[in-house]
Amino acid sequence: TQVETPYGPQRVADSAYFRYEPLTAKFETFISYRFANPWGHVFDRWGQNFVADASGGANYVGAAFSGQVDHPDKHGNMKEFLTKQWRPTSGCEIVSSRQFPDEAQGNYLLNNCIGFHGVLQYKMRDDGSGFAADPVPPLLQSKDQNFRPVDLKFGPDGALYIIDWFNPLIGHMQHSIRDPNRDK
């Protein structure tokens, strides 16, 4: 990626998360890592950030690699903060809503759209200088194999909004372009 900015180009090899400040038009690399397919980034109420990498189902504490690394350098291998149950994942969120019970506050929510069709839920806890998360019962699960939750966010009303891609075929052209189930 190369993005031209008023302050000069921002370059990364492979994947990255960027930070944009609208008032100053600053656009900078926030996280540069060899993600397979980054599909989730969320901050908790304390400003800690967590990153979900879709393809492998990896989830990371962002603080460890949220910092300046000059192109083409990358951060080394990072420890995941939860043991993945399924892959791939798509979209993450932290529960922070009066609409949810007290025991769910601060839980990490993680969509899954292939092996498990629903929203997984993990109880966050401190682990040394980092974090760990333990699975608790899923927030929701669909028996419809076409349910593909790909993002989720809390709205100003406190409700959780979930985007459903709803598609019988997913992948990078493993299926014929003329497959009758495509985009149904």
Could you tell me what each predicted segment is?
Residues 1-184:
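Beta-propeller domains with acidic blade repeats across secreted/periplasmic ectodomains
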